[in-house]
Amino acid sequence: EFNLKTRMEYPKTVLGQKIHQSKTMSHSFPWLHKIKGNILKNEILAPYTSIQIGGPADVLIFPEDVRDIQTILKNKGSQPLFILGEGTNLLVSDRGIRGIVVSLKDQFKDIKRPLFFRKETGNRRAVIKAGAGVKMSYLAKHAARYSLTGIEQLVGIPGSLGGAIVMNAGAEGTEIGQVLRSVTLLNPDGEIQTLKRDELTFEYRKTIFPNGEGII
């Protein structure tokens, strides 16, 4: 949720530095049959990143819904887990990524019409609810269609909303943490939580969550 009234400075993330011999998939991931979404094994990740580089993921999962993600969290055990959005500003090693990669690119793109309200001062405000898979450019344009101001500086930020919140993305003096009202996430146990803005700590290109981990 956002309260509303270009160049991106993302640090690049490097993945897949460690490598070891993968176990047979049926032994490592015996629970995959519980997933409703698409599952790809030993999938090359280059096509899923903006700079088109990267080796294979042991397992690449496209969850159909939140329940799929909960299933992953409850069954993955000690397997590493990485959440992939639009794949912007991301460097994946040619050796690939061991463990599980979950792509949110094709899901969680719901975006609601603004909910308008008036503050005690009489000023008119609006709240927009959007999924983690919504592109930042689309979110900014969606707000503009309703003559809302507050996130227009973020229109040029690459990537999706979920990643932007995790990194407290910003441009031209505006950061996502300045307009964020609340965030709904899954904690490491797969439980749904909603955190208000004042429960989060925003730093330069970083958002600190109370429990340290979670999936937006």
Q: Over which residues does each language-model region extend?
A:
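Anion-binding (especially nucleotide phosphate/pyrophosphate-binding) glycine-rich loop
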Residues: H27-L161
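Structural signature of FAD isoalloxazine-binding scaffolds in flavoprotein oxidoreductases
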Residues: G54, I61-V66, L91-K112, V166-K196, ...
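Flexible, small-/acidic-enriched active-site or ligand-binding loops
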Residues: F202-I208
